[in-house]
Amino acid sequence: MNNELILVLDFGGQYNQLIARRVREANVYCEVLPYNSSIDKIKSKNPKGIIFTGGPASVLDPKAPICDREVFELGIPILGICYGMQLMSHMLGGTVEKAEQREYGKVNITFDTSSMLFEGIEKESTCWMSHTYYVNNLPEGFVKCADTPNCPVAAIENREKKLYGVQFHPEVVHTPKGRDILNNFLYKICGCSGDWKMASFIEHSINSIREKVGDKKVLCALSGGVDSSVAAVLVHKAVGKQLTCIFVDHGLLRKYEGDQVEEVFKKQFDISLIRVNAEDRFLEKLKGVTDPERKRKIIGEEFIRVFEEEAKKIGTVDFLVQGTIYPDVIESGVGDAAVIKSHHNVGGLPDYIDFKEIIEPLRSLFKDEVRKVGIELGIPEDIVMRQPFPGPGLAVRVIGEVTKEKVDILRDADYIFREEIKNAGLDREINQYFAVLTGMRSVGVMGDERTYDYTLALRAVTTIDFMTADWAKIPYDVLEKVSNRIVNEVKHINRIVYDITTKPPATIEWE
């Protein structure tokens, strides 16, 4: 693709992916590279602009991460964020000191609106700060263009060289004008035109896959999740019947999910799909197993065995499709290691299946972009907007040993919970919600008779990035309806509890 490009140099900040996503959301393509990328690599990308991320280090530390000094001589606009601004100042002759008072959280800020970076933005606003050091002397040619009560230099610019820095974080939602500031950098300073669109990505991908594959065979492991579903449909658009998808149904999916996968991909898209009903096989392997990590390992290994058996029936395939997405690439360190990480995306399949090359059509996309591509391709919203679901499925939402009875109980209860959340119009407000069958039984009374049945936990969270999460404040009347339906419609559950723990200290999943 020949899209205009912004490079994000990663100095270890927690928001590096968020910065890249914000740039993409502004219809500008961007890539994340390590801070120590060579100047030749940077030049080869021909970027319209460069963004330095924040980071946990101090520029005063001799071992602090620094970029190639030549990057400032390329004549390309640069925006330094937090550590990125301090680094720019430090490398160009300014000075940085430790602040007497650390700034963390939302603070008031005053912008110099004559700066191109803050053009069209109200002079007084708020921003999100997270720093211990600050710039106290500016490099030659720079001027201050923002300040806060405790940070006299909250933003700097060298208009002639198009070098800009902000001490705050424009990429987070807690900086109300952050997107406007980033847009000013992208469009007014870098001169981007906004040519990153999903429709053009799809067209380019189809042509590229078609050219690469020719008349060869392609194989895809289809789970019914967002990434594998979108990857499969995109590849099918390119090569049609040359693609075969294998859907290993381990019997641990949510209610009706396996049938929906078959209905959508076989009937709607006319994809050559092999559904392997392997519930008995997986449950047999899980007998007596209570440790969640052992469950995961057993299911992962058995999945590979089943897939391998089915793949051998097809014969030699030339290409294996994987749903690797851009965060996988970034987290693996960007570069050769990215391929190694991607191999584990479908449980290590490339180590077992005879193929020549991997196709990763979504490798450059973030999850929200994958969903947009899915919508453009006509995949039903129920699949495209599907919530995160663990690979081992309901096995890690049954606490303790997994049996068919327990899975069936949980599947029915979980379906009611999800159905009532959707009926209440909360399905897009709550980022993830599900039921957990605890290993605990308790005494109850139903129809004047004593019961001794399972306790079911409900979990629902709101989150921006799934790194931290808050429990969802579901209205009591909705919870009451869910509880009444489950105890009346699902056998062997006589008590419902609602998990009101944040992450941290808890994780979102129970196992």
UniProtKB/Swiss-Prot annotation:
Which GO CC annotations does the UniProt entry carry?
cytosol
| Key word Protein transport present | no
List of residues binding ATP: S223, G224, G225, V226, D227, S228, S229
Active-site residues per Swiss-Prot or TrEMBL entry: C82, H169, E171
**Which residue numbers delimit the Glutamine amidotransferase type-1 domain?**
5-195
Q: In which pathway does it act?
A: Purine metabolism; GMP biosynthesis; GMP from XMP (L-Gln route): step 1/1
Q: Name one GO molecular function term.
A: GMP synthase activity
Metal-binding is among the record's keywords: no
Give the catalytic activity.
Answer: XMP + L-glutamine + ATP + H2O = GMP + L-glutamate + AMP + diphosphate + 2 H(+)
Enzyme class, first EC level, given as a word? ligase
For this protein, the record's InterPro entries field holds:
Class_I_gatase-like, GATASE, GMP_synth_C, GMP_synth_GATase, GMP_synthase, GMPS_ATP_PPase_dom, NAD/GMP_synthase, Rossmann-like_a/b/a_fold
Q: Could you say which EC number(s) this protein's record lists?
A: 6.3.5.2
Q: Which UniProt keywords apply?
A: ATP-binding, Glutamine amidotransferase, GMP biosynthesis, Ligase, Nucleotide-binding, Purine biosynthesis
In this chain the GMPS ATP-PPase domain maps to: 196-386
Task: Describe the function of this protein.
Answer: Catalyzes the synthesis of GMP from XMP.
Subunit and interaction comment:
Homodimer.
Q: Which PANTHER family match?
A: GMP SYNTHASE [GLUTAMINE-HYDROLYZING], GMP SYNTHASE-RELATED
Please give the name of this protein. GMP synthase [glutamine-hydrolyzing]
Q: What is the lineage of its organism?
A: Bacteria, Bacillati, Bacillota, Clostridia, Eubacteriales
Q: Which gene encodes it?
A: guaA
